[in-house]
């Protein structure tokens, strides 16, 4: 039986799995396909990817839910399946992870520019993240993994949404370009300081 995630982190390095989409593409899935939908339509492929990472030694299995917010799913006419897709993603990850490994609820960027850089309001972003994270928590994840964020404001809304619905650990990953900053120009020393200030307690 696994111990709480934060306790495990205090004892040793924890190994996460890798990219889901890259391996689904290698298995013949088109890049134009909604990978999150495969939780419902081709679950065996999703589980194959999870199993490969577990066999390689991963301690953490990420749900196949990177793009499973309403704002992204509706681009594939799947906006009404947010809960169903996220619950299925967690279930598939847990079936492979079992009782000993951790399942991280994967939350990716919305694929939209947030204010003041774009038309999507912070409130809209927070609600989209909240809806997804609620389903991930309901499904039984051990932690929330906010992935590949470019905009610090978007990462903040995901953090706030996570705390709206849960006290689970939250991991935030930012995207760094070759020049050492995020695509929106934020340096690591600045976003780490800000994320520390926002860090849920």
Specify the residue positions occupied by each region the protein language model found:
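Domain-level signal for soluble alpha/beta catalytic cores
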Residues: 1-201
């Amino acid at each position: 039986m696994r111990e709480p995630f934060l306790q495990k982190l205090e004892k040793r390095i924890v190994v996460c799995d890798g990219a889901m989409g890259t391996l689904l593409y290698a298995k013949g899935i088109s890049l134009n396909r909604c990978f999150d939908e495969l939780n419902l339509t081709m679950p065996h492929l999703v589980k194959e990817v999870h199993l490969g990472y577990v066999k390689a030694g991963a301690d953490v299995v990420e749900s196949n839910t990177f793009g499973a917010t309403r704002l992204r799913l509706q681009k594939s006419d799947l906006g009404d399946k947010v809960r169903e897709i996220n619950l299925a993603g967690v279930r598939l990850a847990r079936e492979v992870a079992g009782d000993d490994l951790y399942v991280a609820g994967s939350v990716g960027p919305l694929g939209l520019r947030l204010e003041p850089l774009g038309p999507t309001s912070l409130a809209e972003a927070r609600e989209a993240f909240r809806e997804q994270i609620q389903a991930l928590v309901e499904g039984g994840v051990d932690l929330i993994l906010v992935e590949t964020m470019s905009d610090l404001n978007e990462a903040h809304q995901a953090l706030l949404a996570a705390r709206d619905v849960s006290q689970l650990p939250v991991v935030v990953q930012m995207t760094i370009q070759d020049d050492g900053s995020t695509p929106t120009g934020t340096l690591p020393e600045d976003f780490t300081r800000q994320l520390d200030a926002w860090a849920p307690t």
